Amino acid sequence: IGQIIEMIKKIRNSNQELDEGLLKAFELEKMFDKQMRTLSGGTTQKVSAVLAFLFNPEVLILDEPTAGLDPLASEILKEKIIQEKNKGKLIFITSHLLSELDDLITEIIFMQDGEVYFHKKVATLKAETNEAKISKAIASILKHKSVNPNQQESHKALKAIL
């Protein structure tokens, strides 16, 4: 782990202050002598998260950031994401675990079958569906879609107009 982190620091060759908060929170310094190929999926995910935040980027793209993490590590990472969001950073998160997103996101782009199904503010989505959780709000929309077969045709027509 230590070699990977040091190698990335050297490659980036940046004079900026490094954000080692996750490194300490995940207690990865204790594992610096371990080789990446010997790590569990969760520990590998922690290393990836540390590297994503290390150089204090203005934009973060996180693909399934909590996948493979234990509950404590997941909460640590979500707290870090919220801290960075509160600093005004732009953060994109892809996730199939919608329950993980409730405290993290303000907007949602929901894709289905490789197409954007909708793009809304989370508050609007919850208000329109009268649901408090993102996963339930989306399930409500999808359930309504399956009841209304004409919606797919109107969606195609809307796409053609745009």
Model-derived segments and spans:
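Catalytic Walker B motif of ABC-type/P-loop ATPase nucleotide-binding domains
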Residues: L60-E64
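Conserved ABC ATPase "signature" region
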Residues: E6, S14-M31
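Helix N-cap at the start of a conserved alpha-helix in ABC-type nucleotide-binding domains
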Residues: P71-L72
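Conserved ABC ATPase signature
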Residues: Q35-G42
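ABC ATPase "signature
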Residues: H119-K120
